């Protein structure tokens, strides 16, 4: 897991070096023990997507979020009206994730607590791409793209990396 996490941090950092206006910190560390403890402490009866750490890395921000999603609550498909990309890294569990397509019966769900930008949900996604997701998989979902879990075979635990070129996420 550490190699994958380090690779994701490097990839996100290298892609925006030219856009930096201030020097980045020497490093931001999150150990596997810290990540496991954080996700273990999330409620088991709700969909939890909470920030473990958000860092200003020199001209933009990067958030690392821990997610627990119980099997019986896959949740509706959603869309975040933002330029913040979401990079999922699956830790445990399996399910089917759909991305793209059209959000059917789209409705506002208010502003995101992470970015302050509008969020939307729907009853389903038509014409999207579905894939089975297992531990170790990485899925990159650009901002403003419909996405959602259509089914969960088990409870799932994953990390979301959110590179934020606009600096919308509060540092934590």
Give, region by region, the residue ranges found by the protein language model.
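Bacterial N-terminal signal peptides
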Residues: 4-16
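A short, N-terminal "cap"/entry segment at the start of jelly-roll beta-barrel domains
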Residues: 18-83, 171
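Short, conserved beta-strand element in jelly-roll/cupin
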Residues: 82-97, 101, 109-123
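Short, solvent-exposed loop/turn positions at domain surfaces
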Residues: 84, 127-128, 135
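Short, surface-exposed beta-strand-loop junctions and turns on beta-sheet-rich folds
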Residues: 103-105, 156
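Conserved metal-binding segment of the jelly-roll/cupin
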Residues: 131-152
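A short hydrophobic beta-strand segment most commonly corresponding to one strand
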Residues: 153-170
């Amino acid at each position: 897991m550490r190699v994958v996490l380090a690779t994701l941090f490097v990839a996100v950092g290298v892609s925006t070096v030219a856009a930096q206006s201030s020097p980045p910190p020497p490093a931001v560390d999150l150990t596997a023990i810290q990540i496991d403890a954080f996700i273990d402490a999330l409620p088991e009866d709700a969909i939890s997507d909470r920030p473990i750490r958000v860092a200003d890395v020199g001209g933009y921000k990067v958030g690392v979020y821990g997610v627990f999603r119980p099997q019986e609550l896959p949740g509706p498909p959603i869309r975040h009206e933002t330029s913040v990309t979401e990079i999922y890294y699956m830790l445990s569990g399996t399910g089917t994730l759909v991305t793209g397509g059209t959000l059917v019966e789209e409705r506002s769900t208010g502003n995101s607590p992470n970015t302050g930008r509008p969020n939307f949900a729907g009853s389903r996604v038509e014409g999207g791409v579905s894939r089975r997701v297992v531990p170790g998989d990485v899925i990159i979902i650009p901002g403003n793209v419909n996405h959602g879990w259509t089914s969960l075979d088990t409870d799932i635990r994953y990390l979301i990396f959110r590179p934020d070129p606009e600096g919308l996420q509060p540092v934590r």
